[in-house]
Amino acid sequence: MFGLKAKSTKKVLGSIPKHIGIIMDGNGRWAKKRLKPRVFGHKAGMDALQEVTITASELGVKVLTVYAFSTENWSRPQDEVSFIMNLPVTFFDKYVPVLHENNVKIQMIGETSRLPEDTLAALNAAIDKTKRNTGLILNFALNYGGRAEITSAVRFIAQDVLDAKLNPGDITEDLIANYLMTDHLPYLYRDPDLIIRTSGELRLSNFLPWQSAYSEFYFTPVLWPDFKKAELLKAIADYNRRQRRFGKV
């Protein structure tokens, strides 16, 4: 049940995007501005994620997909990668109780084979604990790359054609979507309505390239650790000033 403040905020904002994707960028620069190591920014980014998740849940957002670690991020310094890989352990230990209380369901997309055992264990434990929740889906894109996702889907489709499980004529956009990592999401909410990128960068960085075909984009110079409730509301207000045409006039 929404509180009076949440209901009032929804009324002012107008239409709430059902699926929001966020490219959480700027942790390192945020730390550098404070003369701190990059890992300090990643830690601060966890607090921002918790606040944004609860806010999105209160507003009635159905899916929040966050770009936590890309397939390209393995090329970063090893000590930073190790710290980032431990963040899910810390995040879930600290925040799963409050997310669970708010009926948030945790899921993920990405290739799990390279994830450290403790990272994967923490993720699976959080998924299992919240699997019966019916509220917002907090969908972590962890070791995720959009091109790799599409390549994998093509391979599976090709194999099914070879195995006579599919005819080439059966291949449609909807069928391809069923082979993507987002196929576990509710059908109506698989594609983001709004994609937000923080830190002033103006690119997708391999984030949901198929699913974002008709997404609205919001780029902000705000660094991720500073992206809290007020910034999310600004992004949604901007989204409401758009007219989504989906290729039509």
Swiss-Prot record:
Broad class of enzyme this protein falls into: transferase
CDD domains: Cis_IPPS (cd00475)
Catalytic residues in the record: 25, 73
Necessary cofactors: Mg(2+)
A GO biological process held by the record: polyprenol biosynthetic process
Family as reported in the entry's similarity comment: Belongs to the UPP synthase family.
Protein name: Isoprenyl transferase
Organism: Streptococcus pyogenes serotype M1
Gene: uppS
